[in-house]
Amino acid sequence: QSYFHPPVLQYFVNREDLMGELDGCLADGVLHRFGTGEFTDSLIWDAWTDLSSDLVRRFAGQATSILELKTKTARIDHLKGLPHGGRTILSWSLNTERVIRNEERGTAPLERRLRAAAEAVAAGYPVAFHFDPLVIYAGCETDYRRVVDRMFDAVGPESIAWVSLGAFRFMPDLKATVERRFPHSSIVYGEFVPGLDGKMRYFKPLRMQLFQALCAAI
């Protein structure tokens, strides 16, 4: 919410321009990874638009690049029957139940995300998982290990394209925004220091300790 002003979602309707530029990139024969969930949820518009379905079909027709659809939802029924050719990776952002409950309001619970991932695998899709943002709090290592265990209970490692880790970081201006809009949130009150990129990041030894714990669990 510190990147965009005003902090509202925008959906661009010039899809022909998008597809034309995309076809140009796909035609160069170079491996690309395209994603629509960098600053938003890839599937959040799918109740009103068929963009994700259109993209899945588009990528199924080529053999060099991949599409990643990243989400915190569990709404994938509209994607299950599509001809995807294994060129689309459905990925989920995972977190502890405490973080989901307190900081990710309106998103699918962990169990529903993992169930959707299992359904995606059954439909032939490769899947991926993002432990991002990792939030440090008392007992977090134990909680994140449980999430890893539940992830592998839901999906076998042979179906997972990748797992990524990223600790919570934010632009300095976001702290005031969180305090104003989400006064009950404590997410911005950890041991943060300014990073080389200007973002506030957890003190490096704390980050490394949590990364190492998750890597060992994975």
Name each region found by the language model.
Residues 40-44, 74-77, 88-108, 133-138, ...:
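Conserved radical SAM core fold
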Residues 1-91:
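Conserved Radical SAM active-site core
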Residues 21-28, 78-83, 110-123, 214:
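Structured alpha-helical segments in the cores of large, soluble enzyme domains
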Residues 152-218:
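Auxiliary Fe-S-binding modules of radical SAM enzymes
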Residues 10-17, 47-51, 105-112, 139-146, ...:
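Alpha-helix N-cap and loop-to-helix initiation/capping positions
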Residues 49, 91-93, 140-156, 183-189:
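Short, electropositive alpha-helical surface patch
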Residues 18-21, 51-55, 112-116, 143-151, ...:
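A general structural detector for well-ordered alpha-helical segments in enzyme core domains, enriched
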Residues 113-173, 217:
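Conserved C-terminal portion of the radical SAM core fold
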